[in-house]
Design a protein with these regions (language model features):
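Short, low-complexity N-terminal intrinsically disordered segments enriched in polar/charged residues
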Residues: 1-32, 123-124
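A beta-strand edge to alpha-helix "cap/lid" segment located at domain peripheries
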Residues: 2-3, 52-124
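A generic structural signal for ordered secondary structure
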Residues: 7-11, 26, 38, 52, ...
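A solvent-exposed, acidic/Ser-Thr-rich amphipathic alpha-helical stretch
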Residues: 23-75
């Protein structure tokens, strides 16, 4: 598998892990010292413990996720547009997001930045 194909596969594995509520699967994609800035402009979460706390919430609330366009790979980074559905019933929302992952030489995510804001959230 090429680096490009492997990085695109990580995008799908990330979404699959969120929907499955599989915290271990999501965390396995990240380096131990990775950072997550979600959304961009918030205080980054740094390291395995902070990521576990953040992603536990995501794994508990994401009910669906899908790519909404083709991931773009450049160098050691990939940008990809997707939507997640959170909550159920009349509390369900859809959030349109663009994530950028940066990878280390081992193919682990070392940085994740998520571009989204209030204008990107709508009722499901």
């Amino acid at each position: 598998m090429t680096d490009t194909a492997a990085r695109v596969a990580v995008c799908q594995a990330y979404l699959d892990g969120l929907v499955a509520g599989d915290l271990d699967a999501v965390l396995s994609l990240f380096a131990d010292d990775a950072t997550v800035e979600d959304p961009v402009g918030t205080e980054p979460k740094v390291g395995r413990e902070a990521l576990a706390a953040f992603y536990q919430i995501a794994c508990d609330f994401v009910t669906a996720a899908q790519l909404t366009g083709t991931p773009r790979v450049a160098g050691d980074e990939v940008a990809f547009p997707f939507e997640i559905t959170t909550g159920t019933g009349d509390k369900a929302s859809i959030i349109s997001i663009i994530d950028v992952f940066r990878f280390n030489e081992a193919g682990k995510i070392v940085s994740m930045r998520a571009w989204w804001g209030g204008d990107n959230v709508r009722p499901a």
